Regions:
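Primarily extracytoplasmic ectodomains and periplasmic/lumenal surface modules that are beta-strand-rich
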Residues: 53-54, 166-169, 337
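N-terminal low-structure segments adjacent to metalloprotease catalytic domains
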Residues: 17-150
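Bacterial Sec-dependent N-terminal signal peptides
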Residues: 1-22
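Solvent-exposed, polar/charged alpha-helical surfaces in well-ordered, non-transmembrane soluble domains
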Residues: 37, 41-48, 175, 240, ...
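Juxtacatalytic substrate-recognition/specificity segment
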Residues: 149-261, 354-355
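Soluble non-cytosolic domains of exported or imported proteins
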Residues: 30-41, 163-172, 233-241, 258-263, ...
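Acidic/His/Gly-enriched intrinsically disordered linker/tail segments
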Residues: 237, 256-381
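Short N-terminal secondary-structure initiator segments
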Residues: 81-110, 241-252, 263, 269-270, ...
Length: 381
């Protein structure tokens, strides 16, 4: 068996350990040695910066930064192995360099780890290298791979699709919740893909062990007032429009979801968009039959120890439904301004003190009254 002993290009020292870019000796680098050096040095810089904030990576091609940020997120923590308890178990290897037009190159980078004589592949990426004076900038191949796709514009939203698009759903994505969330000036870029497998290849992720066995996902990035989404959930024509996910998507354009109370956020999504394809009324009916049918249910305890109920094959949090009922009551009394206050109490904390304080401020419901008032909302719903 022929063995390849890769060249090694060390580009970052981390304490006593160096992260190394390996280069197979059989690879065909640019014939110009200076150009080859610039390419490797720039790639090393890109990989080093990939572990930081996306916007701080100066090796990203500015014209395609949003598309590249989707792929760049997949580099985060790529070297670490929890199984082997090693933060730098997987090392990058430049496997292929192929020339394209205008001095560009198609690159393939894989991350391998060694355990004894066994080589373990974590992930493989495709990148397009663009010449920029004495260095290179890098981009996801997404733009290149979809250059013959169609585009549909509505408001500040751009949809890219291969064959057909449900324009009515596209319009809803662009306008629903905007009045309340004041998100009408935020831009959307949406790539509609058949499934996760197709989406990964379009973006430049040809393999990642993390996604073994999965065929559906949605990847999103928010940056400077623009949200880019790659839909890999049977959405090549944007037929599977989900108002629940839309709520989360539009909310994240005006405030980080990490900055709001998660249970209130989910309560809004249930109330305004249902869940798993079920309407709010269907969710509420299942909740009443499976959870609220227990007259001894203590809703205060439920807040600390979640309980779930089924709609079809899907689990739903009973606490999220309770929050939806509270949001409904708050909106009836204070409009969406009150809901916005309720959302912005900050991340959930043990004991939910801020949750109860804001609830008392908005609805006059104290901690002691919480259980009885929730029962009242359920009975009146």
């Amino acid at each position: 068996m022929k063995r390849f002993y890769p060249l090694i290009f060390s580009f970052l020292a981390l304490g006593a350990q160096a992260r190394e870019l390996q280069i197979n000796p059989g690879i065909r680098l640019p014939k110009d040695s200076l150009e080859a050096s610039h390419l490797i040095q720039s790639l090393a810089g890109f990989l080093e910066a990939s572990q930081s904030e996306n916007s701080a990576n100066t090796y990203v091609l500015p014209a395609e930064k949003f598309e590249t940020y989707l792929l760049l997120d997949e580099f985060k923590g790529i070297e670490a192995s929890s199984s082997f308890k090693d933060e730098h178990f997987y090392q990058p290897q430049l496997c292929n360099v192929a020339p394209l037009e205008e001095g560009q190159y198609w690159l393939q980078i894989s991350y391998f780890g060694l355990k004894g004589d066994a080589s373990i592949l974590r992930a493989s990426f495709d990148l397009i290298a663009h010449p920029d004076k004495d260095q290179f900038k890098f981009a996801s191949p997404l733009k290149r791979n979809t250059r013959h796709w169609k585009e549909y514009k509505v408001g500040k939203s751009h949809f890219f699709y291969q064959d057909s698009l449900n324009e009515a759903h596209a319009y809803q994505l662009s306008t629903r919740f905007d009045d309340n969330l004041k998100s009408e000036n935020k831009a959307n870029i949406v790539y509609c893909c058949e499934n996760l497998i197709a989406m990964e290849r379009l973006l430049g992720l040809t393999y990642k062990i993390d996604y073994n066995g999965y065929n559906s996902s949605v990847w999103t990035v928010n940056e400077a007032g623009t949200k880019i989404m790659a839909l890999g959930n049977d959405n090549a024509s944007f037929e599977n429009f989900d108002p629940h996910d839309l709520w989360h998507a539009r909310l994240s354009m005006v405030i980080s979801r990490r900055a709001v109370d998660h249970s209130v956020d989910e309560g809004c999504a249930y109330l305004y968009g249902g869940s798993w394809g079920y309407t709010w009324d269907e969710i509420l009916k299942a909740f009443k039959e499976q959870v609220a049918s227990d007259s001894g249910m203590n809703w205060h305890e439920l807040k600390e120890k979640p309980q779930y109920f089924q709609t079809g094959e899907h689990r739903n949090s009973a606490d999220y439904v309770v929050c939806a009922l509270l949001v409904q009551e708050i909106e009836a009394k204070h409009g969406f301004e009150g809901v916005w206050e309720f959302l912005n109490i900050g991340p959930r904390e043990k004991g939910n003190a801020k949750f109860y304080q804001k609830l008392e401020s908005l609805l006059g419901i104290s901690v002691e009254e919480y259980n009885a008032k929730v029962w009242e909302l359920i009975e009146n719903s």
